[in-house]
Amino acid sequence: MRTTGIFAAVLFSLALFSPGPGRCDELGESYFPLKAGMRWEYTVTSNQGQPQKLIITNLAPREVNGVKVVPRKWELGGKIFIELMKQDDTGVYRYAEQQGEIAPPSLVTPMEYHLKFPIAQGNSWNMTTKLGNSVLTVGTTIESVSDEVKVPAGTFKDCLKIKQAGENAEGTSILGYEWYAPKVGVVKSMVTIKRKTKEGAASSEQRV
């Protein structure tokens, strides 16, 4: 749930429009496919602007500092962001990231888990993320392993429902939900972001 760079990572609402063509590692691969060539197209909506198209493509594996990772290219609003994903026996996480296709990668510390094993209802973990200049610790919980989700691409059953919530001392807070479908990945994501203004009032953003 990293919000630096051009995308706010998974912190916007999206609905799967057309997806591209079991154990811990098998379950991780099922809910977060990392096969090269897979492609996802989403419609991103926000109360801050017009709907946009987001395309995510898995590229061929490569090495960063001797670690094998899978680059996932995000294309949104004419800009490109690449997250370098790693899966091991602890889960699926963002190991590094890069702004654009030719920029050098930078390591993500601490690691940001998209999924952490075991994949089971009630499993939870924390991660640190940035929202603009604000740093938040976000609690992540698998609330369900059997949700049904309807989006423009169709109806998906047996989805993971993951809740993400965090707030810092500056009054910035996040409440988000993601749904992962077996063999597809994320099919829906939505988030509410609240910030305090200089006058002390709270402003909110709902992306659905």
Regions of interest found by a model, annotated:
Residues 24-208:
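Conserved functional acidic sites
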Residues 8-18:
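Bacterial N-terminal signal peptides
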Residues 1-5:
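Positively charged n-region of N-terminal signal peptides that target proteins for export
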